[in-house]
């Protein structure tokens, strides 16, 4: 075994241990470990459920604490195992064990980098699940087809990230594609990863719907907002709501269309409209739609406060959701993010959900 190779592995493992130690400090590992023990003790008390609100709050706190403590504990254990394996390979001159150590070090590097990346999630709602609203812009069939391509893109992205994605509502276009759709994304830091996707997405291509092969430009809007749990109070006056039921269309199978199971709720003071047709049960669709409305109202209030703050900071650029953020030019094989200038030439991969470079850059630059 060449000394240079051994030194490289040893140096890599030492660097990983150093970075893991920094993460323990930054994420308050010791404090969170102690607090987790306290919370577990409180939850073991049979009387804890006498106060259900407090018990639920403790349950949420436990989940949050465990996400840090469990992750860093497992990382430390695996780093220790990798170091032991390296020392064994070194002592015995075992090539196969050394190769295994190199593989372990590479996997640990990816894990440490992922935890470091998550330090950029500064929004209080970043750990939450989220909803993605996709709306076709003007342009008829071409715009509706573009909206359906974006729907597929985000479903594939969620699949890559290990998120659960559920299409709650989908309205078909008159000829092809979709007019609009809503996806619920469930997973750790779903909103944190996806929130910078809010904005206008522009497509330029030779249209398959134009027999002359002309070049067309289409727009679709994407709006991402966090799911809000029951611990956050959002007042909704029932008198402010108009609730309509209708027969579902699009995904859902034939049976779903036989009853008025789909639900549309309009919040009249703000004009916010939410729809859900995912379930055969009108009751469950109504509950999901109310959860969506609560999240939309909470997000609207946050954006209102942010807008007021931005007025005081004239150096800030417009971060309103209605601005163009990304351009997809298919015949030139170019997808460019207009905020970060990140560009990719593999348009097929991007449309298949390969958005990591764009999302990483937008989070690092704080767009």
UniProtKB/Swiss-Prot annotation:
Modified residues (N5-methylglutamine): 254
Subcellular location: Cytoplasm
Post-translational modification: Methylated by PrmC. Methylation increases the termination efficiency of RF2.
A GO molecular function held by the record: translation release factor activity, codon specific
Keyword Ligase: no
UniProt keyword list: Cytoplasm, Methylation, Protein biosynthesis
InterPro entries hit by this protein: PCRF, Pep_chain_release_fac_I, Pep_chain_release_fac_I_sf, PrfB
SMART domains for this protein: PCRF (SM00937)
Gene Ontology annotations for the cellular component aspect, listed alphabetically: cytoplasm
A GO BP entry: viral translational frameshifting
Main location: cytoplasm
Cleaved signal peptide residues: none
Function text: Peptide chain release factor 2 directs the termination of translation in response to the peptide chain termination codons UGA and UAA.
PANTHER family referenced in this protein's UniProt entry, alphabetically: CLASS I PEPTIDE CHAIN RELEASE FACTOR (PTHR43116:SF3), PEPTIDE CHAIN RELEASE FACTOR 2 (PTHR43116)
Assigned protein family: Belongs to the prokaryotic/mitochondrial release factor family.
Note: The gene for this protein contains a UGA in-frame termination codon after Leu-27; a naturally occurring frameshift enables complete translation of RF-2. This provides a mechanism for the protein to regulate its own production.
Protein name: Peptide chain release factor 2
The species this protein was found in: Burkholderia mallei (strain ATCC 23344)
Gene from which the chain derives: prfB
């Amino acid at each position: 075994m060449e000394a240079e190779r051994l030194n490289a592995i040893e140096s890599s493992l030492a660097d990983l241990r150093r970075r893991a130690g920094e993460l323990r400090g930054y994420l308050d590992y010791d404090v969170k470990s102690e607090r987790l023990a306290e919370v577990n003790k409180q939850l073991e008390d049979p009387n804890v459920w006498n106060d259900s609100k407090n018990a639920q709050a403790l349950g949420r706190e436990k989940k949050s604490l465990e996400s840090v403590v469990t992750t860093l504990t497992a990382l430390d254990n695996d780093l220790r195992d990798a170091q032991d394996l390296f020392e064994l390979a070194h002592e015995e001159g075992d090539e196969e064990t050394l190769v295994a150590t190199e593989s372990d070090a590479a996997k640990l590097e990816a894990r440490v980098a992922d935890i470091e990346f998550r330090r950029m999630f500064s929004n209080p709602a970043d750990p939450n699940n989220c909803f993605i609203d996709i709306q076709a812009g003007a342009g008829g069939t071409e715009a509706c087809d573009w909206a359906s391509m974006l729907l597929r893109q985000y479903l594939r992205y969620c699949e890559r990230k290990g998120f659960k994605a559920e299409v709650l509502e989908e309205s078909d276009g008159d000829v092809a594609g979709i007019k609009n759709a809503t996806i619920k994304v469930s997973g750790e830091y779903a909103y944190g990863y996806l929130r910078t996707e809010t904005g206008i997405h522009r497509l330029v291509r030779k249209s398959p719907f134009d027999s002359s092969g002309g070049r067309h430009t289409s727009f679709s809007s994407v709006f991402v907002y966090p799911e809000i749990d029951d611990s956050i109070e959002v007042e909704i006056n029932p008198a402010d709501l108009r609730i309509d039921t209708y027969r579902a269309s699009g995904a859902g199978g034939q049976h779903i269309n036989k009853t008025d199971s789909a639900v549309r709720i309009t919040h009249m003071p703000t004009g916010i409209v939410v729809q859900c047709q995912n379930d055969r049960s009108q009751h469950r669709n109504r509950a999901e739609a109310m959860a969506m409305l609560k999240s939309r109202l909470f997000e609207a209030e946050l954006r209102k406060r942010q807008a007021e703050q931005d007025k005081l900071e004239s150096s800030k650029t417009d971060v309103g959701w209605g601005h163009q953020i990304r351009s997809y030019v298919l015949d030139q094989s170019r997808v460019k993010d207009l905020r970060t200038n990140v560009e990719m030439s593999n348009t097929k991969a991007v449309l298949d959900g390969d958005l990591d470079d764009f999302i990483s850059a937008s989070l690092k630059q704080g767009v």
